[in-house]
Amino acid sequence: RNIVEYLVNRKDCRVTAADIREGSNWSGIAADLGKSRYFKPVLDDFTEKSAFEKLDRQFDEIYMLAAIVGVNRTLREPAEVIRVNTQLTMNVLDWVAKNPVRRILFSSSSENYAATTDLFDADVPTSESIPLCIGEVKHPRWTYAITKMHGELAFIHSAKGLNYEPTIVRYQNIIGPEMGFGHAIPHIVERFAKENGSP
């Protein structure tokens, strides 16, 4: 949402926002005559390769933010997290192999070193050079982390052959408008409220 709005507001590039459902600010951007010519929304399921046929063939940059995220969904649907997140990564790379770009930013997660900090007492804040690991493989929590580790490796090690500059961002519990309560920060707030007798 914020990246789309930021880039459209610059008015020096055209932005294609591709997702399985409409972003909360897309209709407002599309209705604004001063912004709409810089913006193209594409709604489809990008775990299906056929969805990529709706995209233009020339882009300078890709911001790969699409994924199943959130504690609740990861615990409830671990197999779907693996399927969707892995398929999205591979489909983007297959598309880039035929439609070159200059840069790809992959949205990863600090969850990638959560087990390292837990099991090996690593420092917090944690160095990005620390080895990554997961905890107990039977716990669904780690399905999300493993898809993000896979994504990092896939985008980093495909970069030379596909001639793009990769950037990996390991977010730590970001939150913003309209994200709902299925994420870490709302969970912490809810737990605090319950422990202190607040509604």
Where are these regions (language model features)?
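N-terminal Rossmann-like NAD(P)+-binding domain of SDR-like oxidoreductases, especially those catalyzing
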Residues: 1-174
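Glycine/proline-rich active-site loop of Rossmann-fold NAD(P)-dependent oxidoreductases
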Residues: 149, 162-167, 174-187, 194-199
